[in-house]
Each structure stands twice: as structure tokens, then as C-alpha cells.
């Protein structure tokens, strides 16, 4: 099926994908824009997975102070090139992540940044609670991974649901940005400050 330049332009504006990628997606999906968007997102996420291991030596430190001035966040958002680091959409992503940190108070970026002793301690606490409920060892082994997943969702930034769209996690937002910018993007670290807090 032949696709029009208007369709290609519309798809480019909606996805940020290249012209040839848009043309191919529209041809593959018979000119259906919605299906082409889905196709490009899936393709983009596949590309994002390939980029995940690449080094992120550029980026920005994004500052956010909540309206009352009593809570603030500094977040290090990393990327591969200064071109992306200076992009308004990259900075908007950083502000979105900083707002998330302000609202949800995560303790760590991901489970990889949690000290091993803290994970072991949490596992022990969860096992003890399950034993106290009368659960058997084989039941505990099945339940414990779900308890730990919930624990990670509570304290790890990338596993938290976005405060703006709870159908997505912060990791989903990062993966979408990787697909959009065509390079790896990571959260290096963050600090949350609160008046009267420790």
C-alpha cells in the first residue's frame, strides 16, 4: 500500500522516529497510524534494550524545589552525548524524575544500589512475618519473591509507578526516552532534601 507524505509527517510528529522508519511502519501496517505507532514503540524498545549497556558519560544534574520551598531534589541524569543532554525533552525527563523523588521519597535508584545486608535483613523480616502467620517453608518460598518485589517498588526509584501515569514505572519512562533519543539514559544518583528532615 502506498502511504502519503502527510501520513509519514503525522507519524513522525507523534513518535519522533526517522522518516524512513515511519514509512516502513506505515507500509507494514497498511497505512494504519495507530498500529504504526505501536510497531515503532515495540521496535524502539527493542533498540533501547540494545543500548542499555552503552556508557553514559554525559548528562545533567537537575534541581527541583517544591513550591513550598521545604523539599528539594538533585538528580543526576546521564546520557551518551552532550547533544541529548542539552535537549529540552531530556531536561523535562529529569524534572519529571525529580518530581517523582520529591513526592515518593525513594531511597535507592535500583535494587543494585541497595546494600546486600539490607536486602538480607528485609528477607529475614519477611520470612519471620510469614512464619508468624503459620506459612510452611514451601509456601514461604513462593510468597517471598512477591514480598521482595513490593519492597523494591517502595524504595527503588526505577520500580516506582509514575505519579503522573501509574500505568508506567520510572524505568518505562527511561526506556521510552532511550527509544526516542537513540542512546542510553540512566539515573546516576539523587539526593532528596527536606526542611527538618535527616
UniProtKB/Swiss-Prot annotation:
Q: Which organism is it from?
A: Leptospira biflexa serovar Patoc (strain Patoc 1 / ATCC 23582 / Paris)
Q: Which Pfam families match?
A: EF_TS
Q: Where is this region: Involved in Mg(2+) ion dislocation from EF-Tu?
A: 81-84
Q: Which PANTHER family match?
A: ELONGATION FACTOR TS, ELONGATION FACTOR TS, MITOCHONDRIAL
- List the keywords (alphabetical): Cytoplasm, Elongation factor, Protein biosynthesis
Please provide, in alphabetical order, the Gene Ontology terms of the cellular component aspect for this entry: cytoplasm
Provide the primary localization.
cytoplasm
The record, for CDD domains, names: UBA_EF-Ts
Q: Which InterPro entries match?
A: EF-Ts_dimer_sf (IPR036402), Transl_elong_EFTs/EF1B (IPR001816), Transl_elong_EFTs/EF1B_dimer (IPR014039), Transl_elong_Ts_CS (IPR018101), UBA-like_sf (IPR009060)
Q: Where in the cell is it found?
A: Cytoplasm
The text of the family note is: Belongs to the EF-Ts family.
Q: Does the keyword Ribonucleoprotein apply?
A: no
Cited PROSITE patterns: EF_TS_1 (PS01126), EF_TS_2 (PS01127)
Signal peptide as annotated in the record:
none
Its biological purpose is as follows: Associates with the EF-Tu.GDP complex and induces the exchange of GDP to GTP. It remains bound to the aminoacyl-tRNA.EF-Tu.GTP complex up to the GTP hydrolysis stage on the ribosome.
List the protein's name.
Answer: Elongation factor Ts
Amino acid at each position: 500500500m502506498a502511504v502519503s507524505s502527510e501520513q509519514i509527517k503525522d507519524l513522525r510528529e507523534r513518535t519522533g522516529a526517522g522518516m524512513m522508519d515511519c514509512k516502513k511502519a506505515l507500509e507494514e501496517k497498511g497505512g494504519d497510524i495507530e498500529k504504526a505507532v505501536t510497531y515503532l514503540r515495540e521496535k524502539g524498545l527493542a533498540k533501547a534494550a540494545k543500548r542499555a549497556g552503552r556508557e553514559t558519560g554525559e548528562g545533567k544534574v537537575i534541581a527541583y524545589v517544591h513550591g513550598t520551598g521545604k523539599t528539594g531534589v538533585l538528580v543526576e541524569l546521564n546520557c551518551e552525548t552532550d547533544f541529548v543532554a542539552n535537549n529540552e525533552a531530556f531536561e523535562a525527563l529529569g524534572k519529571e524524575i525529580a518530581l517523582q523523588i520529591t513526592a515518593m521519597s525513594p531511597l535507592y535508584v535500583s535494587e543494585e544500589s541497595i546494600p546486600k545486608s539490607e536486602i538480607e535483613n528485609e528477607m529475614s523480616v519477611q520470612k519471620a512475618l510469614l512464619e508468624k502467620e503459620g506459612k510452611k517453608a514451601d509456601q514461604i518460598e513462593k510468597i517471598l519473591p512477591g514480598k521482595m518485589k513490593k519492597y523494591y517498588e517502595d524504595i527503588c526509584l526505577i520500580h516506582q509507578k509514575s505519579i503522573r501515569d501509574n500505568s508506567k514505572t520510572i524505568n518505562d519512562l527511561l526506556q521510552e526516552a532511550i527509544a526516542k533519543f537513540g542512546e542510553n539514559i540512566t539515573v546516576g544518583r539523587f539526593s532528596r532534601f527536606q526542611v527538618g528532615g535527616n
